[in-house]
UniProtKB/Swiss-Prot annotation:
GO terms for molecular function: enzyme inhibitor activity. This is Electron transfer flavoprotein regulatory factor 1. Acts as a regulator of the electron transfer flavoprotein by promoting the removal of flavin from the ETF holoenzyme (composed of ETFA and ETFB). GO terms for cellular component: mitochondrion. InterPro entries: Complex1_LYR_dom, Complex1_LYR_ETFRF1_LYRM5, ETFRF1. GO terms for biological process: negative regulation of oxidative phosphorylation; respiratory electron transport chain. Pfam families: Complex1_LYR. Belongs to the complex I LYR family. The gene is ETFRF1. The keyword Mitochondrion applies. homotetramer. Interacts with NDUFAB1. Interacts with ETFA. Interacts with ETFB. Keywords: Mitochondrion. Its main location: mitochondrion. It comes from Bos taurus (Bovine).
């Protein structure tokens, strides 16, 4: 069981690192923060607590994906739709 959790944690770290490439404050900032969070929890041994932390990490992944999707949507909307409420 410990090996499966370890693999899951490593996979989560790898996926978060990949998603952090486009983080608004920069990839270096994201990588540093991610590493600090994982190092802070490296001594957790309780499988239930580890599962809880993994779920929190998955939630963060979903939030990042939503952030990127929204940013792309806003950029496309700005390019293709003019704001009719603007006054000149």
């Amino acid at each position: 069981m410990a090996n499966s959790l370890r693999g899951e944690v490593l996979n989560l770290y790898k996926n978060l690192l990949y998603l952090g490439r486009d983080y608004p404050k920069g990839a270096d900032y994201f990588k540093r923060r991610l590493k600090n969070v994982f190092l802070k929890n490296k001594d957790v041994k309780d499988p239930e607590k580890i599962k809880e932390l993994i779920e929190r990490g998955k939630f963060v992944m979903k939030e990042l994906e939503a952030l990127y999707f929204l940013r792309k949507y806003r950029a496309m909307k700005q390019r293709y739709y003019s704001d009719t409420n603007k006054t000149k």
